Amino acid sequence: MLEAALTAGLCSVGADVESLGVLPTPAVAYLVGKYNADAGIVISASHNPMEFNGIKIFAGTGYKLPDEVENQIEAYIDNDCAGIELKTGAEVGRVYRRDDGLQDYVDHLYESIHGDLTGLRVCIDCANGASAAVAQKLFPRLGAKCTFIGIEPDGQNINKGVGSTHLENLEKAVVEGGFDCGIAFDGDADRCLGCDEKGQEMDGDKIIALLAMTMKEKGRLDGDTAVVTVMSNLGFIKYMESQGINTEKTAVGDRYVLENMRENGFAIGGEQSGHVILLHHATTGDGELTAGKLLKLLAESGKKMSELNGIYAQYPQVLVNVTANAAQKKAYKEDEVLAGFIENEQQKLMGMGRVLVRVSGTEPKIRVMVEGQDLDAIHRCADRIVDKINKRILGQ
């Protein structure tokens, strides 16, 4: 339904549409340039359930649209598209179906990864999403012996108990099956997380650290810098410093990471949640590219994944999501008393931790994150903040 409505709208203003079927978000970012399109559009719920479906738009360069252009599009929609001329007759756009997108994207990934994974046994969770067809072609072609889960999409089960937001099934499968490691994507495959052979999680921080170290050793870490967000673990930051790698920190959101990378000429960046951007090969976060590079690193290292996963100790971190609608999120942003309370909680940690409270841009939630060396202390801190939010914003 969404594809049909979107296609009809585009054709009604004279645009021709090439429909590529079900493909990962980063595939569209790549193919928009390869096919010389003016823009690329993805219908996706990202890592969320299917009822959160929306659209992501890429410019002809393969990069996401800047905020000001997205705001202009939203303004047109809010104004019932006033001033936009609707075409008639022969001027109406046409729709074309293309079946070569999948293979073109797989070929691009294969050439970008450029590795031999022979001898690796890997369990891969495709989240019942767009990565399923790609992963089943790509990783065996690279030489890995793979078992796949989450490869039975029915249009409704995407991200449901599987994928990067539900690692428990993958971790169990890896341990029970004796795999060398596990890889998990989200529904539209712009995120990648993993686990080692012991079933221990590998988040985006760990993956970025490992890939950045490898790039530095090969002289490919531009500016000796990785770009991350304020959510990155303090253990990660301190480890990178110890290895002579700078970290640039941005607001949460892969678009802000990418903006910093492009402005300053950096080659790697990403988020703890699994968005990893490798700018030498891609214009956006690409889960399958990230997985391929990580598996190549593992194969060439001669080590177990648990050894790689243990390169640094993470600081304990507590994350609590408070359900809040748009009005409640707005009220939180404007509450100066609450802001002062949160600042006071930060001071109580006395430099041994940090507090980050933010409004989610993709879900109806206020996220409370507290990090520090004392697990009991950060739990108490998070509880106090959540209780204050509930009382002042939610009236509970």
PLM feature spans:
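Proline/glycine-rich low-complexity loops and linkers
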Residues: 11, 20, 27, 71-106, ...
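N-terminal small/polar loop signature for handling phosphorylated ligands or for N-terminal nucleophile
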Residues: 1-52, 137-195
